[in-house]
């Protein structure tokens, strides 16, 4: 889905890692929340509170999922899922434009 309709957007940005990662929360009419974000170059560790689907819209990133020992490269159009209450690592060499969907 390249477009969300009939949504509310929380204006205040979620800013992490000294401004190298930022996102905005989008609330769909169904009550579902998503974040649209952007990452600058760096290595980051994220903790999840609920299941997430991370979709890369543009750019590239390397992901180290929980329990894995090898990084996996993702390109634009690819996604991965992460369970609730885990940590995962992200390495960005150029930039990453992403959409995070939260699921139960």
Swiss-Prot record:
Q: Which reaction(s) does the protein catalyse, per the Swiss-Prot or TrEMBL entry? A: a purine D-ribonucleoside + phosphate = a purine nucleobase + alpha-D-ribose 1-phosphate; adenosine + phosphate = alpha-D-ribose 1-phosphate + adenine; cytidine + phosphate = cytosine + alpha-D-ribose 1-phosphate; guanosine + phosphate = alpha-D-ribose 1-phosphate + guanine
In terms of PANTHER family, this protein maps to: PYRIMIDINE/PURINE NUCLEOSIDE PHOSPHORYLASE (PTHR36540), PYRIMIDINE_PURINE NUCLEOSIDE PHOSPHORYLASE (PTHR36540:SF1)
Q: Which domain of life is it from?
A: Bacteria
Its Enzyme Commission number(s) read 2.4.2.1, 2.4.2.2
| Enzyme class, UniProt record, top EC level | transferase
Q: What is this protein called?
A: Pyrimidine/purine nucleoside phosphorylase
**Which keywords appear in this protein's UniProt record, sorted alphabetically?**
Glycosyltransferase, Transferase
Q: Which family does it belong to?
A: Belongs to the nucleoside phosphorylase PpnP family.
| Matches recorded under InterPro entries | Ppnp, RmlC-like_jellyroll, RmlC_Cupin_sf
Q: What job does this protein perform?
A: Catalyzes the phosphorolysis of diverse nucleosides, yielding D-ribose 1-phosphate and the respective free bases. Can use uridine, adenosine, guanosine, cytidine, thymidine, inosine and xanthosine as substrates. Also catalyzes the reverse reactions.
What cellular component GO annotations does this protein have? cytosol
* Single GO MF annotation: guanosine phosphorylase activity
């Amino acid at each position: 889905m390249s477009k969300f309709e009939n949504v509310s957007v929380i204006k205040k940005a979620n800013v992490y890692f000294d401004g190298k990662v930022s996102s905005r929360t989008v609330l769909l009419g169904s009550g579902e929340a998503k974040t649209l974000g952007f990452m600058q170059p760096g290595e980051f560790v994220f903790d999840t509170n609920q299941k997430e689907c991370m979709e890369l819209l543009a750019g590239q990133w390397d992901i180290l999922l929980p329990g894995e020992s090898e990084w996996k490269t993702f390109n634009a159009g690819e996604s991965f899922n992460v369970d609730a209450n885990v940590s995962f690592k992200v390495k960005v060499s150029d930039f990453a434009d992403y959409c995070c969907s939260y699921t139960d």
